[in-house]
C-alpha cells in the first residue's frame, strides 16, 4: 500500500529488502537490518553498475544529488501515515531548484544505516532516510529523518543529522521540511553532515519537542 502511495509522487519507486528476511530476524539481528539483501543489491547494480573501484569516490563522481529511502524501522505506522505527506511537502522545492533525485527506495525491515548502502549504490551525494522511530506511549507514529553526506557502509551516527518526532502532534511536515532543506543546502555547501553541521533554523519554525539537528540513531 505504501509503495502505491509513494508512486503517486510522480517519481520512480524501488521496492527493496534488508538482509533481515522477517520481523523476528530484524529484532534479533540489528546488523542485518543495516544491510541490503543480496537480491536488492543485484537489483540496484543491474540498474546502475557500481563505480569503477579505480576511480576516486568524490562528490563530483556521484550521479545524483539526493537519494531518498523510506524504511519501516520500528514503526511502520509512522511511515504509513507520514512519509507521503512529508515528501509531498519536500519534493516540489527540490525539483524546482534542479536537484538530481535518485529513485525513491522503499526498504522493508530496514534500519537507519541501510540508507548508506542504498545511497552509495545509487551514487548519491546525500541520502535521506525516513524511518519509523521507536514507539512511545504518546507517540506511536513518530517519524525520524536522517541525512548523510557521501553515504557508504561504515558511516557512523556522528556523521548524520537527524530531525525526529515528525508528526502532527510533534514537528509538522512543513516545519520538518524547512529544517531539512536548510540542512541539505548547508551540507552541499560544506560537503559534510553530522556533529559539525548545525541546524540554524529559527526556533519559531517547528521548535516542537523532539526536533534536533543531531541525534543517535533510534532505529
Which residues make up each language-model segment?
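Short glycine-rich or small-residue beta-strand-to-loop segments that form or flank ligand, phosphate
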Residues: 65-78, 128-130, 164
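Glycine-rich phosphate/diphosphate-binding loop of Rossmann-like nucleotide-binding domains
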Residues: 76-98
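A contiguous pocket-lining binding segment that forms or flanks enzyme active sites
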Residues: 92-140
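Gly/Ser/Thr-rich loops at beta-strand to alpha-helix junctions
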Residues: 22, 73-78, 110-111, 134-137
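Short, charged beta->alpha transition segments
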Residues: 27, 32-61
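C-terminal functional extensions of proteins
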Residues: 133-219
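Solvent-exposed alpha-helices and their adjacent loops that cap or buttress functional pockets
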Residues: 6-8, 52-62, 119-123, 137-139, ...
Amino acid at each position: 500500500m505504501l509503495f502505491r502511495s509513494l508512486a503517486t509522487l510522480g517519481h520512480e519507486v524501488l521496492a527493496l529488502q534488508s538482509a533481515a528476511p522477517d520481523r523476528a530476524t530484524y529484532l534479533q539481528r540489528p546488523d542485518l537490518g543495516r544491510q541490503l539483501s543480496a537480491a536488492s543489491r543485484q537489483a540496484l547494480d543491474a540498474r546502475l553498475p557500481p563505480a569503477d573501484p579505480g576511480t576516486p569516490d568524490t562528490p563530483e563522481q556521484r550521479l545524483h544529488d539526493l537519494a531518498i529511502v523510506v524504511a519501516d524501522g520500528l514503526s511502520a505506522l509512522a511511515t504509513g501515515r507520514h512519509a507521503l505527506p512529508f515528501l509531498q511537502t519536500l519534493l516540489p522545492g527540490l525539483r524546482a531548484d534542479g536537484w538530481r533525485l535518485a529513485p525513491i527506495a522503499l526498504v522493508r525491515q530496514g534500519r537507519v544505516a541501510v540508507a548508506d548502502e542504498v545511497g552509495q549504490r545509487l551514487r548519491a551525494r546525500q541520502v535521506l532516510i525516513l524511518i519509523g522511530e521507536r514507539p512511545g506511549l504518546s507517540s506511536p507514529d513518530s517519524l525520524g529523518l536522517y541525512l548523510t553526506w557521501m553515504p557508504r557502509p561504515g558511516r557512523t551516527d556522528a556523521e548524520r543529522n537527524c530531525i525526529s518526532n515528525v508528526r502532527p502532534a510533534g514537528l509538522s511536515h512543513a516545519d520538518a521540511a524547512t529544517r531539512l532543506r536548510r540542512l541539505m543546502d548547508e551540507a552541499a555547501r560544506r560537503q559534510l553532515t553530522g556533529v559539525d553541521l548545525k541546524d540554524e533554523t529559527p526556533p519559531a519554525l517547528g521548535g516542537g519537542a523532539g526536533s534536533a539537528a543531531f541525534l543517535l540513531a533510534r532505529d
